[in-house]
Amino acid sequence: MEEFKDQVVVVTGGSRGMGKEIVLAFAERGAHVVIASRKIEACEMLAEEVRLRFGVRALPVACNVSDWDQCGELVDAAYAEFGQVHVLVNNAGLSPHYPSLVDVTEPLFDKTIAVNLRGPFRLAALVGHKMVESGGGSIVNIGSVEAIRPSHMALPYAAAKAGLHVLTEGFAQAYAPTVRVNTIQPGPFLTDIADNWAEGAREELEAVVALGRCAEPAEVVGAVLFFSGSASSYSTGALLRVDGGWR
């Protein structure tokens, strides 16, 4: 519980779902948090909650990670406030629906790639570079089982998450030995994305995982803490499946 005390953790997509649970977990352990998402009001509400509950500092930042410049502004804001970042969690994601593959539009495709791949690239590049200068840190990417078990109804998303695996390997080599970069690959989680699943989708997913159920958002926390701290000191460029035993 003391390992992350007074460390600075940046979480994208941090105001809800898995991101919110990650923020709460680090704040409970004494870390100061930068909560980034598109909607500043939600970030501000969560920031106030963690200040009151855990007595840590919290910086809410409006950031659309698909915007190259906004990624830079997020990093600038974090370092202006805290002077250092110890952990970056690239959690923000987007998996839009479409009626069929032929109906995927260029804007939908580009937006999906931008949120799920371009944003994590830019943030890892900027923060990882600064981590090297300051002596080290950990970058944790949130991927998806879609990267290895793609559905035809989420192909742009799956392709972006597969690209995230490549970024993980590449950044792990680029910023070694002081910065570690790893990816968590969740299976079906009951986040906001699940609210838009088609009728019967949850039952279909639960039928193909060994544990027989979808995960709650907080069930990603253990893996994130593992990759962020000393327990994974010899892990970099690694991929950890948190998918309930996807068959």
Segments predicted by a language model, with ranges:
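Substrate-binding pocket helix/loop in short-chain dehydrogenase/reductase
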Residues: 99-101, 105-113, 139, 194, ...
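Active-site helix of classical SDR
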Residues: 124, 160, 168
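Alpha-helical segment proximal to the catalytic Tyr-Lys
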Residues: 129, 172-177, 233
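Short C-terminal tail/terminal secondary-structure segment
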Residues: 95-98, 149, 225, 236-247
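Conserved glycine-rich cofactor-binding loop
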Residues: 8, 15-17
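The beta1-alpha1 cofactor-binding region of Rossmann-like NAD(H)/NADP(H)-dependent oxidoreductases
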Residues: 40, 62-74, 106, 218
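Residue(s) in the substrate-gating loop at a strand-loop-helix junction
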Residues: 144
